Structures are given as C-alpha cells and as structure tokens.
Amino acid sequence: MVRTEVEIGRGLTIKNPVMTASGTYGYGTEYKDFIDIDRLGAIVVKGTTLHHREGNAYPRMAETPSGMLNAVGLQNKGVHYFVEHIYPVIKDYRTEMIVNVSGSTLDDYAETSRIINELEHIRAIELNISCPNVKQGGMAYGVTCEGAASVVKAVRRAYDKTLIVKLSPNVTDITEIARAVESEGADAISMVNTFLGMAIDAEKRRPILSTTTGGLSGPCIKPIALRMVWQTAKVVQVPIIGMGGIASAADAIEFLLAGATAVQVGCYNFVDPAAASYIVDGIEDYLRRHGISDVKELIGSLVIEHN
C-alpha cells in the first residue's frame, strides 16, 4: 500500500497529486461518463469571472507542432450562474473542486472570490493573474511583482480558504513573481500558465487566431515549465503545483522530482479524456516499483551531481 495524499496549502489535503487544469476539463461533469472523476486529486474548473463573458471571436484555437494555441477569452456565464447552476451539481463530488478566478480589476477579483468563499464545499480557488489590468493599459497583472502582489493582497482580504496563484511564464524571472505572491499570502503556487505564441496561415498571409496571438500549451513547453518549477521550488516555502505538457505518469513524476507537490494535466485531456486517471495509476505503480511508501518522498528529490 502506498500513500499518495499531499497538502496543497492551508491544511488542504488531496487524495493524490494529480489535478486537471482549468479550461481543459470544464466543470468535471463533461468527463464523468469517461472516467471515475472521484479518482482524481482535484479538478480545477474553468475560469470564472464576476460577470458573463462571451469570449473571443472564432477561430480561437489552433494546433501547433507538439502543442496547441488557444485564445478562448475566458468564456463563462459568470460567478452568479456558477453558484446557482453549477455548484449544486458538483458540490457532492468526492474529489476536491477548485474554482479558477479571473478578473479585469482588483475589485472584480475580490468580489468573485468573496462570493465563492461562501460556498461550503469549495475549499480553494486558483487565481489567474495572467488577465489584463484594464485600468493600467491592459498589461497583465502577473508580469510584474507589483501587479501580481496587488491581486493577491486584494483577494486575501476577501477570501480565507486555500488560495492558489497561477503564474504567467511570460516574465523575465518567474521566481521574483513567486516570492511576491507568497509574501502577500498565497498558500500555493500553480505554474506555469500558457506561453504567448502565434500561428500564421502562409497561404492567406494572415494569423490563424482571431486575436493574432494566444496561449501555447502542450508537450512543447514541458522542458521550460519543468525548469521554472525547479528554480521556483528553491526560493519559496509554499507548495508548488506544476504543469506544462504533462501527458504521462513519467512527466508528472519529473515535476515532483523538480520540487512540485502536485501537478495539473492540461491539454492532454483533449487527446485522452482518461489521461489524468491513468497518470494516477502510473504514479502509484512507480512508487511500488521503487519501494517508495509515500509520494511525498519524491518531492524535490532530484539528484544533481556536479563534476
């Protein structure tokens, strides 16, 4: 028997370190006919904003070599719809349900978080700080220490449960952003969000996405994401939830070895709806094969030999 429980901040323990990434798993209900979703450690539901958002115009997704671009634009029906129609359906799932929160202003973030704070069976939120600050020329909150810290500070006043902050990789030094959000009360850090990229239709001489650029995810980003997790784990004390190109148990284990406490499976859910479940099984098999009794023994156990 191996132990797979991990703590992801403020005393919140999940049954295993495998989570699904926001925007790739809907509300979990969409996948319940494919797998036993209660087998997962946690499900991070799609991005939720204070008000209804239509999202960006089509086309807003594009396949790329070893990955995909997306520019969905946080399409959702708003937090009040979530409370009235989605929460009653998902609140009794036996896996942890985490709400991804996005906003255009600090007040938006704080108010959405305050509303979710009242939901008994939602014990954690994940802040998407890659959103543009509409009051500061559209620059994403998460690309400066000051911007990232301001979101966490505003939300921390309104939210008293586990607060996970999702970091943008589109920065010079992600460890500085990580330290900034930790100092303002983040209980955990999830990383990394998508990389800014673009795709072009050479025949038409036009960008493929309606927004020109979009977020790049998939196996192509894994080596960079892994490096960022490894660097960040050395400078923060809070748990790290690693993501970026995870498609197998071996991928997930690499992130744990680099210092992540848990992982999120993202766009590979589109390839195989049961991927996250297989990864849970694969981690357990790895622990048994290596005679490891507790998954926590893997966290940050990477051996680096210097010649």
From Swiss-Prot:
**PROSITE patterns according to UniProt:** DHODEHASE_1 (PS00911), DHODEHASE_2 (PS00912)
> Which positions does UniProt annotate for FMN binding?
S22, K46, G47, N100, N128, K166, V192, G218, G244, G245
Report the locations given in the UniProt record: Cytoplasm
Under the heading Gene3D superfamilies, the entry gives: Aldolase class I (3.20.20.70)
Q: In which pathway does it act?
A: Pyrimidine metabolism; UMP biosynthesis via de novo pathway; orotate from (S)-dihydroorotate (NAD(+) route): step 1/1
Q: What is its main location?
A: cytoplasm
Instruction: Quote the catalytic residue positions.
Output: C131
Kind of enzyme, top EC level?
A: oxidoreductase
| Binding sites annotated in the UniProt record for substrate | K46, N70, A71, V72, G73, L74, N128, N193, T194
Enzyme Commission designation? 1.3.1.14
Keywords noted in UniProt: Cytoplasm, Flavoprotein, FMN, NAD, Oxidoreductase, Pyrimidine biosynthesis
List the Gene Ontology MF annotations in alphabetical order. dihydroorotate dehydrogenase (NAD+) activity
Please give the superkingdom of this protein's source: Bacteria
Q: Which GO terms describe its biological process?
A: 'de novo' pyrimidine nucleobase biosynthetic process; 'de novo' UMP biosynthetic process
**Cofactor binding, per record:** Binds 1 FMN per subunit.
This protein's cofactor list reads:
FMN
Q: Which reaction does it catalyse?
A: (S)-dihydroorotate + NAD(+) = orotate + NADH + H(+)
Q: Name one GO cellular component term.
A: cytoplasm
Family statement drawn from the similarity comment of this UniProt entry: Belongs to the dihydroorotate dehydrogenase family. Type 1 subfamily.
Record's function text: Catalyzes the conversion of dihydroorotate to orotate with NAD(+) as electron acceptor.
According to the record's subunit comment, the protein's assembly and interactions are: Heterotetramer of 2 PyrK and 2 PyrD type B subunits.
Recorded protein name is Dihydroorotate dehydrogenase B (NAD(+)), catalytic subunit
State the organism named in the record. Answer: Porphyromonas gingivalis (strain ATCC BAA-308 / W83)
Gene transcribed to yield this protein: pyrD
